[in-house]
Regions:
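Aromatic/His-enriched, Gly/Pro-containing loop or helix-boundary segments
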Residues: 1, 41, 143-146
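Helix-loop-helix
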Residues: 1-39, 85, 181, 200-213, ...
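Juxtamembrane extramembrane loops of integral membrane proteins
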Residues: 12, 25-104, 110, 114, ...
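Generic detector of short, locally flexible boundary/turn motifs and exposed helical patches
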Residues: 46-53, 58-61, 143-149, 160, ...
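Short secondary-structure boundary micro-motifs
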Residues: 57-60, 66-69, 93, 151-153, ...
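Hydrophobic alpha-helical segments with strong N-terminal bias
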Residues: 66, 73, 237, 241, ...
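Soluble non-transmembrane domains of integral membrane proteins
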Residues: 73-321
């Protein structure tokens, strides 16, 4: 290929590299009518009131007697999670997912003592901290909840018919926990028709490295019909305030999220991302104003995986938290790649094989473009071997501008475009970007092993050492190395590489695999495996096409074209003016 062609390929590679770096940093339910007695086996432990608790000094009027009472911890279990609730504040204490493990093999914990949830409301002159008041358990479901929805009910009784009731509703196969707070017979006692929910969230480390998780963390929110996000910053506090029209807020991790939702819309929201150190995960402060209607308010909490199929079924734009690329790229992922995965995973247990089949399907779809690109490269190889071209190289070896102009004239006489081989590559770039976006965000690949890789969602590190090497890191990914080697093999095999006559451009075929290796070395092993398979298929395809291409027929066809376009005056006028002027200046 000509120098211009190799420059085009090199720039495409650099663009892919820079883009991926940037990407790494972008009906009311019924309340239970019957209150069953609480089964004692659901009460895990009881803790006495702490002595000299400062809450006892709070000026909260008639609610002071509900401070500092003994606390019970209750357990609710479904097929998806195990949740612990405390009677103090009728609050969620911790939640662990039973189907997923963290890097140490323990259940993924998405809520624990590091997370804080504080509810306050105003009554008369008092500001009441609901999260510090002691409730009684009036109904607790028999667990595990496996067949039908069920509820847990907590109550704080002020008078015979005046009470605060907190109801949690659970579904057997749903990661949502719905909470309803009822102020019964409060009439005009509440100063404001809302509660304030203040939340402090520390992003839980669910994967093996916090530094690898950090680029995928953000605070997402849905405002009206749009989903946007607040990107945390290591060095400064970031704050956003909204008035109404916010329907959910999500502290997104890499593969799991903690999401709060109010279908009526939060009447006011403040989001804060706090500074954090390198190698740590972000910490957020969220203040939500929950509107109350007829003494009732509702809020849902989603603590679960960021799997596209789960998020999409809720119909609330949860899936827009997943970084699947820009609008057009996203359509490729949601319209082609994800559906293919959904179909294949029903029949094939190995995701490594699924990825290989996906590469085969992509190669079949791109075969027409690959054929056109190969033909263009073969034509340029034949042209560069013509005596006329070699004579031009020798005649103008000291005058590159003149050589460029004369070659451009010759190419036009032959009816070829030296950059035509790059056009099919450009058309394939959206698919490349889609794959780069999809694989690191694909929950399906999390902790899925293949060959020597223990987790396809991150890099494989079979070869590693105990110190950091700049750019390379502390390991070598064998999948990334395979991608680099197969890329080099394909590049050297293609006709473009053999047609590079400019001495300064001959290093480009070797630089491209190096760039790919350095990037993929700390990237998803699934992406490296995908491109390894794709390269092997491309090499096989190239060997087949090489047998199909007749160089003598190409030469004959080129000479026929030249004969038809033999008017040199016209051809010389067709040379770009800037190129002719450059030749004259020399």
């Amino acid at each position: 290929m000509s120098r211009e062609g190799w420059i085009g390929i090199f720039l495409i590679t650099i663009l892919m590299f820079l883009w991926t770096l940037w990407l790494a940093h972008s009906a009311r339910p019924q309340t239970p009518q019957k209150e069953n007695p609480v089964p004692t086996d659901s009460i895990e432990k009881t803790t006495p009131a702490t002595e000299d608790r400062p809450e006892q000094a709070l000026d909260i009027g008639p609610y002071a007697r509900f401070i500092g009472l003994p606390e019970s911890v209750l357990v609710v279990q479904t097929p998806l999670y195990r949740a612990f609730f405390r009677t103090t504040g009728a609050a969620l204490m911790s939640l662990e997912l039973t189907r997923y493990q963290d890097a140490s093999g323990k259940p993924v914990t998405l809520w624990d003592e590091r997370q804080k949830s504080e509810l306050t409301f105003a009554e008369g002159r008092y500001l009441i901290p609901l999260h510090k008041l002691s409730f009684e358990v009036t109904y607790l479901p028999k667990t595990p909840i496996e067949k039908a929805p069920d509820s847990a009910v907590f109550r704080l009784t002020l008078a015979k018919d005046t009470f605060i009731q907190v109801v949690y509703r659970f579904q057997p196969e749903d990661y949502h926990i719905e909470r309803e707070i009822i102020f019964q017979n409060f009439n005009d006692r509440l100063r404001n028709p809302y509660l304030v929910h203040h939340v402090i969230i520390e992003t839980p480390q669910t994967e093996r490295s916090a530094s690898l998780m950090q680029p995928y963390t953000a605070l997402y929110y849905r405002q009206g019909e749009d989903v946007d996000y607040l990107q945390p910053d290591e060095d400064e506090k970031i704050e956003k305030t909204f008035q109404g029209n916010i329907y959910w807020i999500s502290a997104k991790g890499h593969f799991f999220t903690q999401l709060f939702r109010n279908d009526a819309g939060y009447s006011a929201v403040t989001l804060r991302s706090l500074p954090f150190s390198k190698g740590e995960l972000p910490k957020y402060e969220i203040t939500l104003q929950l509107p109350m209607e007829e003494g009732r308010l509702r809020e849902s909490l989603y603590l679960g995986p960021l799997r596209y199929t789960y998020l999409k079924k809720y119909g609330r734009d949860y899936e827009k938290q997943l970084n699947l690329g820009w609008s057009f790229i996203r359509y490729i992922n949601t319209g082609f790649i994800i559906p293919v995965f959904q179909v294949l995973e029903k029949y094939i247990p190995s995701y490594g094989i699924i990825i290989a089949i996906l590469a085969l399907l992509v190669k079949i779809l791109l075969s027409p473009l690959t054929w056109q690109s190969y033909l263009a490269g073969a034509r340029m190889q034949v042209i560069n071997e013509l005596p006329e071209v070699k004579a031009l190289d020798e005649k103008y070896k000291d005058d590159p501008n003149k050589l460029m102009m004369e070659k451009s004239l010759l190419y036009r006489e032959l009816g070829v475009n030296p950059l035509s081989g790059c056009i099919p590559l450009l058309l394939q770039m959206p698919l490349f970007f889609a794959m780069v976006s999809f694989f690191p965000s694909a929950f399906e690949l999390r902790q899925e092993s293949f060959l020597w890789a223990k987790d396809l969602s991150t890099y494989d590190d079979l070869i590693r050492w105990g110190f950091h090497i700049p750019i390379l890191g502390e390991h070598i990914s064998l999948f990334a190395l395979m991608t680099a080697l197969t890329t080099l093999a394909y590049t050297l095999l293609s006709p473009q590489s053999t047609s590079t006559t400019t001495p300064g451009m001959k290093w480009l075929p070797y630089l491209t695999p190096v760039i790919f290796f350095l990037f993929l070395n700390s990237y998803s092993a699934a992406l490296s495996w995908y491109y390894t398979v794709l390269n092997i298929l491309t090499i096989t395809q190239t060997l087949i096409m090489r047998r199909m291409v007749d160089k003598e027929a190409i030469i004959q066809k080129l000479r026929q074209r030249r004969q038809k376009r033999s008017n040199a005056g016209v051809m010389r006028q067709s040379v770009p003016r800037w190129l002719r002027q450059a030749g004259k200046r020399r």
